[in-house]
Regions:
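PLP-dependent amino-acid enzyme catalytic core
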Residues: 1-220
Length: 220
C-alpha cells in the first residue's frame, strides 16, 4: 500500500453557503432550515493526479476519504478510433469505467459504481463498529459488496428478490457482507423500506446515497 495523506476539505451547505467541518459521516447541515445537499470544498484548487499504482485513489486530492482501500481500479481514458471514425471526429476521447483488459480497465464488477463504493467506503472510520446499510436494485449492491468484501467492511445490502441475478461476482464474498431481500414482485422502493427498518437499530448506519458527498465526488 502506498503512503497516503488525506486531503483537507470542508463541507458547504448548498442552500445557505454555510461552511463547516466534516464530523466523519455528515450527510447534511444540521443548522439548515430547508432541504439541501452539502458539497465538499477542497483545500487543493488544482487536482494533482497520483501514479496508476494508487488505483482509484490517484484522484484522492478531490475525494473526501480517510484512507486507501485494497484492489481499487481507476477509470481509463483512451483515444477512440472506431467511434471517432464513424462520427467523423479526429480527437474523440472516451473515459471507460468497467472491465476491458485490452485498454487497461480492470473494474471486476464491470460498473462505474465501483468509483462510488471506493470513495464512500474510504470515508468510513477504520474503527467504525456499526454495519453500513445500502439499498440497491443492482449495480450499486454489486459494487459495495465487492469493495466491502475485499476490505472487510461490515455491510448489509437490501435488494429486491427479483434483482438477485445482478449480484454476480468473480469469487466468494467475505462473511462481513450480509443480504436481506424484499419479496418477489417488490421493487427498489421496497428495498429502501426494508433497509430503513434495519436502520432503526443503532447497530446500523445509512450510506446516504446522493446525500453522501463521497458518493457524488467519487462519480465525478
Amino acid at each position: 500500500m502506498k503512503d497516503f495523506t488525506p486531503t483537507f476539505y470542508t463541507l458547504e451547505c448548498v442552500a445557505t453557503g454555510r461552511e463547516f467541518p466534516d464530523e466523519g459521516w455528515t450527510l447534511d447541515d444540521a443548522q439548515c432550515k430547508c432541504p439541501s445537499l452539502i458539497r465538499t470544498r477542497y483545500a487543493k484548487k488544482q487536482l494533482e493526479l497520483k501514479s496508476d499504482e494508487y488505483g482509484f485513489y490517484k484522484f484522492a486530492d478531490w475525494l473526501p476519504v480517510r484512507r486507501m482501500l485494497e484492489n481499487s481500479k481507476a477509470p481509463v481514458t483512451y483515444k477512440s478510433k472506431g467511434l471517432a471514425a464513424h462520427l467523423g471526429l479526429e480527437n474523440l476521447y472516451i473515459t471507460f469505467n468497467g472491465y476491458y483488459p485490452a485498454i487497461g480497465a480492470h473494474m471486476t464488477t464491470c460498473s462505474f459504481k465501483e468509483t462510488e463504493a471506493y470513495s464512500v467506503c474510504a470515508r468510513i472510520d477504520e474503527n467504525e463498529k456499526r454495519v453500513l446499510v445500502v439499498a440497491s436494485a443492482g449495480n450499486t449492491a454489486r459494487a459495495f459488496a465487492k469493495v466491502c468484501s475485499d476490505n472487510r467492511i461490515p455491510l448489509l445490502l437490501s435488494v429486491p428478490a427479483d434483482n438477485l441475478d445482478a449480484l454476480w461476482f468473480d469469487g466468494p464474498l467475505d462473511p462481513c457482507v450480509k443480504l436481506i431481500c424484499s419479496e418477489k414482485g417488490g421493487d427498489y422502493f421496497d428495498a429502501i423500506h426494508l433497509s430503513n427498518l434495519a436502520l432503526k437499530s443503532d447497530k446500523f448506519y445509512a450510506e446516504g446515497g446522493a446525500k453522501n458527498v463521497a458518493r457524488r465526488d467519487g462519480m465525478d
